[in-house]
């Protein structure tokens, strides 16, 4: 990958602007999950250790450009960052036209989405960002799919543009999983709708050896195979698409296994009575809310023999205890597998947390939308810009 890496640069005495993803949930001024802040600390520490004058910026929420509000301010983030770094981290409110910072110091630049022109990747604004620094570091993989002034434009105009450790770790892991995977490559794609994961399914079916579908997506594939799905969430108009994806898999010698048993209920409620049924025994008033134990075991065996596992989405309504066993079985199979494993997407990360398997998954992507777009085979604007600068 032809991207200049921050880790390879001499930053001594240099002004370094780092774009991080510090978009954390804040409730009444209190940060409720600091995972992204914690993740950014090693990059900032490294820049300080290398003797740089460090400026860090990020977006937070979706503020109106050109107006400052307390609820959109990075002030709570600055306080937490200072505690984690053990140094003062002043928050600079108006920073586009110049920032005072000395080597060995770090400042946090207020929410970049407050700047007029940020969202539209305004060239004038991007040039102003670039003028602040000797080196620009893009370390926010979670926003790499957005062409904005702080994630794309500035990369074009900064004297030097580099990928930060977090971004590069993410890209290295994704390349290892998709570009040069240890075989067999197994992907788990689950979610409520085929329509939202259509590009993902269509791209992965050309790469994987096995594609396990789950959730509402699986129901559409089950219906496409001629089985009844009762009242289950599914998309009848996408049955031809599902059949095409199955045909594409077959042509390549890949497999899309379907459940042989499922867990059903009459109502979509946490305390609904759960019944395990053979796939052929689903009634007209049944809702399929999880894969059955027999299917979960079969899928777990596929995971055990995989060389690479890409996981995006829980296979059942795992928030409801009675319909969580399929997801838990697969999660534990991934955790105990020797395969290179990568997991990403909000619901997937919630399942990783619920079953406490983070330490057993090779790489956990915090990228969200960027992770999905990469899996869909799309070019991420920030990555393309960094590659162009690395030539």
Swiss-Prot record:
Keyword Electron transport listed: no
Top enzyme class: transferase
Catalytic activity: (2R)-3-phosphoglycerate + ATP = (2R)-3-phospho-glyceroyl phosphate + ADP
Pathway: Carbohydrate degradation; glycolysis; pyruvate from D-glyceraldehyde 3-phosphate: step 2/5
UniProt-listed PANTHER family: PHOSPHOGLYCERATE KINASE, PHOSPHOGLYCERATE KINASE 1, CHLOROPLASTIC-RELATED
Keywords: ATP-binding, Cytoplasm, Glycolysis, Kinase, Nucleotide-binding, Transferase
Subunit-structure text: Monomer.
Any one GO biological process: glycolytic process
SUPFAM superfamilies assigned to the protein according to its UniProt record, in alphabetical order: Phosphoglycerate kinase (SSF53748)
Predominant location category: cytoplasm
UniProt-recorded name of the protein: Phosphoglycerate kinase
EC number: 2.7.2.3
Organism lineage string: Bacteria, Pseudomonadati, Pseudomonadota, Gammaproteobacteria, Lysobacterales
Binding site for ATP: 197, 319, 345-348
UniProt cross-references to HAMAP family, sorted A to Z: Phosphoglyc_kinase
The keyword Transport belongs to this UniProt entry's keyword annotation: no
Localization in the cell: Cytoplasm
Entry GO terms, CC: cytosol
Family: Belongs to the phosphoglycerate kinase family.
Residue sites binding substrate per the record: 21-23, 36, 59-62, 113, 146
Molecular function per GO: ADP binding; ATP binding; phosphoglycerate kinase activity
Domain of life: Bacteria
